[in-house]
Amino acid sequence: IPGGLSPRDVTDPDVQEAAAFAVEKYNAGSKNDYYFKERRVVEAQSQVVSGVKYYLMMELLKTTCKKTVGRPKGYQEIQNCNLPPENQQEEITCRFEVWSRPWLPSTSLTK
């Protein structure tokens, strides 16, 4: 549907790339002392708008990896972080909008 929202498979490589970008940007902007990693993409939609806008609902888990000033971790490093014991785990559900314009190349987290 041109201009409309279309459901996307959460395992689609483009969706996974947008999710990884969202996790990195979330952690960069979060005031939490610890990194949150992707548990799963719950739902994904896309919209063609001068590029592609991905609308993602994701579950994130707080890790035991402490943030270091001036040395942000990338997505793969964050995903390799350990989790605290189950009774101490913190899970959050986030909605992200990722706007991808590969010809620029430009990707941004708009929400």
From Swiss-Prot:
Cystine pairs: 65-81
Alphabetic keyword roster: Disulfide bond, Protease inhibitor, Secreted, Thiol protease inhibitor
Domain Cystatin: 3-103
Site-annotated residues for Reactive site: 3
Record bears the keyword Ribonucleoprotein: no
GO terms for cellular component: extracellular exosome
Gene3D superfamilies recorded: 3.10.450.10
Residue interval(s) of motif Secondary area of contact: 47-51
Primary site of residence: secreted
Cell compartments where the protein resides: Secreted
Source species, domain of life: Eukaryota
GO molecular function: cysteine-type endopeptidase inhibitor activity
Tissue-specific expression: Expressed by the venom gland.
Family: Belongs to the cystatin family.
Role played: Inhibits various C1 cysteine proteases including cathepsin L, papain and cathepsin B. This protein has no toxic activity and its function in the venom is unknown. It may play a role as housekeeping or regulatory protein.
Protein name: Cystatin
